[in-house]
Amino acid sequence: MRLSIARRRWLAMLAAPLIAMPSTRSRADAATGGNPPWTLFTFGDSILDCGRYNAHGVHPGQLLVRNDDALFPEFKGRDLQARGPVRLEHRAVDGATVDDLAAQVRGLRTSGPGVALLTIGGNDLLRGLARDSGAGMRRFETALDRFLTALPIRPVLLGTVYDPTFGDDTRNFLDVAPAIVRANLRRVNDILGTFAQRDGRLADLHAHFLRGDPSWFTRTIEPSLIGASEVRRVFLPLI
């Protein structure tokens, strides 16, 4: 069957927009430079959820994804956004212990590549592990193992628990002998190190913060604005 010239022109007009229109995927690839977006997840305690402890409301996850160039010009162009498309899913909660981690993954949906940051153990020490003689530490290890095994994100970057006394026993603020506290802090960090070898990498906040000063902290134990940036400094090269 032969088509009239007029009908052929009409069909060509209909087809032209379809040919010219890029696919949704093509448009997304163009917007991201061809790189698929990935997600930075944060889990754990106030080391990662410290926005309420500074006037700017910033926490390490935010600074990692998008630096505040006015506050921290040193990190201009060094944030994760500079490497490509990335989003933050912030789930860490101030005050969390290892038993609270399960609630932080409730409703979690993962798609595409991702990296998880985890800081945990400091509140567990404050709530009893600092004076523990063994049983509590085993429960901590078991609970952390359960959480990490179920977490559908790899790698996991585990941050060690820092020491706000800078290793100075005269700054001890607990009613437990400093030697006992330090031994249990070391045990918690050893547990974190073991899981970091298995599931990702270790962010040694403890070692880094020993080289800091009191301006890195507020309210004795919480990261200050500077402290939030220093937490970011430790995690950044591991991502």
Please tell me what each predicted stretch does.
Residues 1-17:
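N-terminal secretory signal peptides and thylakoid transit peptides that target proteins
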Residues 29-90, 109-110:
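Serine-esterase "nucleophile elbow" of acetyl-processing enzymes
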Residues 40-42, 88-92, 115-119, 157-160, ...:
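Structural recognition of the beta-strand scaffold that forms the well-ordered cores
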Residues 78-86, 146-156, 188-203:
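A structural motif corresponding to the C-terminal end of an alpha-helix
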Residues 98-139, 163-164:
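Oxyanion-hole/transition-state-stabilizing segment in secreted/luminal serine hydrolases
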Residues 166-204:
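Substrate-gating cap/lid alpha-helix
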Residues 185-189, 198-201, 216-239:
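Histidine-centered active-site loop/cap adjacent to the catalytic His
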